[in-house]
Amino acid sequence: SGLKVALVDPAAPRKPDESAMDLRVSALSRASERILTAARAWDAIVPHASPYCDMVVWDAASTPERPDALRFSAAETAEPNLGHIVENLRVQWALHESPLLRGVTEVRSALAGLEFDEGSARVTLEDGRRLACQLVIGADGSQSVARQLAGIGRSGWAYDQTAVVAHLHTGKPHRETAWQRFLPNGPLAFLPLQDGRVSLVWSTTPDEAASLQA
């Protein structure tokens, strides 16, 4: 591309070993797979990803067998599956190791200041170093320091929900199916992982979440 790129992050990515486990998982759609393939990261992700070919959604007053449950199936499309469930650390490491990032300079520090001029920016790091650039991309989450330093506002609201996450071995096989039940306090999801495991994601009130973890 001819661009010089610096990636500023105070923490180096952690290389996962074969037994590594991350309670944070993502559902990667077929479109996400195409993006990660173009980024030359998918081949490193797919050995650790579990495809899901079906999805079943129902509410608290129903059961997954009833006709009012929603069902989505890859068999109804021209695709081999609906997507994959994979632990986040696998995606992060695969992207970090992508050949497309070999020309990127990694800077182990945190953002401390931003100044903008016409067509340029100056970045000050916590260790005192300064970087001059034409473009700053803030990809540092909902509490983005880059956004705050750039003076960009935001709007938001509280959902009064907390997610409890865990990996489980269930009494019955997951059958490459994502299961989601909507309860009065929030959705409960069982997402298929490798080795017969499922990822439990239970969104509920803070009080019930504390009770579940007690």
Predicted features along the sequence, with ranges:
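Conserved FAD-binding catalytic core of PHBH/FMO-like flavoproteins
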Residues: 36, 136-214
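Conserved N-terminal helical subregion
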Residues: 48-149, 156-162
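Short beta-strand/turn micro-motifs composed of small residues
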Residues: 9, 59, 168
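Short, histidine-centered active-site or binding-site loop motifs used for metal coordination
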Residues: 12, 76, 204-206
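N-terminal FAD cofactor-binding segment of flavoenzymes
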Residues: 19-62
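A short acidic, helix-capping loop that chelates divalent metal ions and anchors anionic groups
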Residues: 15-18, 78-81, 208-211
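Residue-level detector of anion-binding/catalytic polar loops
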Residues: 4, 42, 105, 153
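Glycine-rich FAD pyrophosphate-binding loop
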Residues: 1-24
